[in-house]
């Protein structure tokens, strides 16, 4: 069964780390564009009639007055409110809260795993190249993509602590914790089933460090 997808070429903000994958057949977080309220760094609040989250770099996509899909500059954004959840700017991506304690908590941003995608292209010549290369231009067209041409996704988790976002990973987290919290986190890390990409594990860490 064929599906119509938007072909988008745009500059990708580099991200680090290696995470467990999931699969999607869409380039956006939502199946359709929908209303959102956007809060900007200049203090303005903008009501956007048609908005979405672009999974290539977890950024804001919106339809302008001419009916053209556009990508917003993430550096100008603070928060995006959809009807079901809010996204907050974390470095170069927009991330949603998984769990919170007051104003702190655990946040997640899903992005397309370009390394895995490009490797799949090399291994399977039947897959259509979506041309997700780096460029400063947005190029839109439609493609017929089959069921087998799904895109790999990886989650990036962050802890919000004292107003700052910290990547949820051992080397980033342990160095900022005091001795007792490091001991507790290391104890949790040694338990069977612990993973830095498992939300249940990260929620337990959140309760230790926050």
Task: Describe every region a protein language model picked out.
Residues 47-168:
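Aromatic-patch recognition
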Residues 23-26, 42, 71-74, 169-172:
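General structural signal for secondary-structure boundaries
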Residues 1-25, 205:
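Bacterial Sec-dependent N-terminal signal peptides
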Residues 34-51:
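Glycine-rich, compositionally biased intrinsically disordered regions
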Residues 142-204, 210:
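A short, solvent-exposed beta-edge/loop patch
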Residues 22-39:
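Short N-terminal segments immediately surrounding and downstream of signal-peptide cleavage
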């Amino acid at each position: 069964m064929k599906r119509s997808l938007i072909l988008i070429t745009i500059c990708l903000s580099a991200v680090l780390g290696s995470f467990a994958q999931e699969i999607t057949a869409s380039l956006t977080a939502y199946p359709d564009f929908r209303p959102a309220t956007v809060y900007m760094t200049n203090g303005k609040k903008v009501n956007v009639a048609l908005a979405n989250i672009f999974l290539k770099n977890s950024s804001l996509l919106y339809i302008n007055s001419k009916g053209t899909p556009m990508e917003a500059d993430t550096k100008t954004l603070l928060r995006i409110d959809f009807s079901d959840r809010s996204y907050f700017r974390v470095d170069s991506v927009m991330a949603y809260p998984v769990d919170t304690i007051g104003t702190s908590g655990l946040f997640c941003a899903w992005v397309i795993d370009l390394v895995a995608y490009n490797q799949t292209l090399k291994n399977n010549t039947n897959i259509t190249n979506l041309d997700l290369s780096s460029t400063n231009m947005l190029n839109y067209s439609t493609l017929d993509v089959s069921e087998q041409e799904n895109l790999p996704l990886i989650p990036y988790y962050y802890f919000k602590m004292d107003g700052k976002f910290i990547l949820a990973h051992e080397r980033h987290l342990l160095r900022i914790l005091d001795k007792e919290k490091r001991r507790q986190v290391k104890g949790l890390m040694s338990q069977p089933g612990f993973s830095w990409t498992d939300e249940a594990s990260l929620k337990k860490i959140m309760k230790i460090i926050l």
